[in-house]
Structure formats: C-alpha cells, structure tokens
Amino acid sequence: MKIAILKKPYCIEIEEKKLKAKLAPDEIRAKTVVSALKLGTDRGNYEGAEDVPGAPTYPRWVGDSNIAIVQEIGSEVGEFKVGDRVVSQNPHQSEWIAKESTNICTIPEGVKDEDAVWSTLYTLSAYCYTKANFIPGENVAVVGLGILGLGAVAMGPIFGAKKTIAVGNSEVRNDMAKKNGSRPFCFK
C-alpha cells in the first residue's frame, strides 16, 4: 500500500509499505477512495509547527479522515461486509487494516464520498455542544470559522440552537456560515 509521509517541513513523500497478509478475526481490510485534509493540523504539520498535537517529531503521517471500500473481513466481523463504503480515521494511505471496533462507520446510500469524508471532523464540532452542556433553545456563538467552526455552525440547528452567531475574519467563511443559518460577525 502507499502512504503519504511528511518527512520534514514542506516535504511529503509517498512510500510503499506492506500490510500484513492475514487479518485477525476482528479486523477489516479496506481500500481508500477519498482522503480529506485536516486543514489546520495538516497545514501546521506541513509548515513545521512545533505545537501540533500528537506529532512531536518527523517523519509524521498526515490526514485522519478517509472513505474506503471494504475488501476483506476477519472471521468474527459482524458489522461490515465486503463492498461496504466506510468512513474511517485512518491517515492518507491507499489501503488499511483496522479493528472493527475502531472509528469506522458505514456510509448510507445516497451520501457522496466528498460529503461523507468530513463526518469525522464534524463529530468534533458536534462534541462541542455536548461538552458545553448545551440546552436546545439557547443561543450559540461560534468563534473561528475553520472546518471545525463551520461544522459547529452547521450543527446549531440540529442541536436546536435558537440563534447561531458566527464570528470570523474571512468574508468567504462568513458567507458559508450564513448559508448554514448563522448571523455572521466579521472582524477585520
């Protein structure tokens, strides 16, 4: 399989790696179709930021959100079958093996790969509502309109926010937030 490895700042290489041939009973093997960048973290890794969580030294793998097709399943796997489209939190690699119990989820029919690939990041946005003990009917202010902030804006109506106020410094991102029902406030 091939995997994107960040060797040093501004230097990504595609490496060939061997996956084990035999699966454990609770593992699946899948082939990646689409992989998404984690925009802030991957950019920080690429630019050599010192404070990227979980990545203290080089080489670093990048990415943690991909869409794949299940190619093979272990003898005890019950949730997935060969041919299933799944979303996972694996790095940018062409093929992977993971335990059935890890963060892997079947993608419903009708959901495009390009939309589903963001779902792992949007779960972080949704978690903000849980962590804040949000109560439906309250107002929400989202400060920062990166991918996680825009996800939090999109989650406002789903969680029952009365109003969602989006605070950012980009006209483009404020427009995106507005399309999701927020009232943008732009700092320049």
How should these model regions be labeled?
Residues 8-10, 24:
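Residue-level recognition of beta-strand termini and adjacent short loop/turns
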Residues 21-38, 47-90:
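Glycine-rich beta-strand-centered segment in the early N-terminal region that forms part
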Residues 3-7:
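A short beta-strand micro-motif
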Residues 59-67, 71, 79-143:
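NAD(P)H dinucleotide-binding glycine-rich loop of Rossmann-like/cofactor-binding domains
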Residues 11-18:
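Short glycine/threonine/proline-enriched tight-turn/helix- or strand-capping micro-motif at secondary-structure
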Residues 42-43:
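Conserved catalytic-core motifs of eukaryotic protein kinase domains, centered on the activation segment
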Residues 112-187:
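Mid-domain Rossmann-like dinucleotide-binding core that forms the NAD(H)/NADP(H) cofactor-binding site
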Residues 2, 27-29, 139:
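Residues that mark the start of a beta-strand
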